[in-house]
Amino acid sequence: MGLIYLLHVRAMLNANKISSHGFRKDDRFEVTACATVVGTINDNDSTFELDKQCFSITRSGVFAPRFDLKSGGVLIATARQKPFRNYYTLAFDGKDWTFKAVVLLATQFGLFENDTQRGSVSAGPPLHSLKDITADLPDELPREIQMFLISLFVRQLTAPAN
């Protein structure tokens, strides 16, 4: 009698910068899962689209900014950044997560639940860091929260200091 093994494979998300058009700086990213487009991130407008639904990210605060994810004016999740660090705490669905840089140049972030790493988001190669961004995040996080984390990561990569 053969054994049946169930293998759970997480759907990795990939984000790639879309070519700019016009005179305006246009940082837009196409996000795919299994080579199928699932959404678009617009870093300039702090928005993303997922399954034809629009989400916005609003920032408040200067030294310890807070980022609110909203859809249709309804608050979905909040991420708070530690002052002057690539370190966020994410409150969602009664759980607290930590999303922080795990390498010196902040080209890779880890997602932690308590002290256990549960996922990661990584930039592409050094000269093309905005291409081939890869997110390996837990399936228990809804896709809009995964897109929120990728958006925060893209914000770090495109910040003037980087």
Q: Where are the regions a protein language model picked out?
A:
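Intrinsically disordered, low-complexity proline/glycine-rich segments
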Residues: 2-162
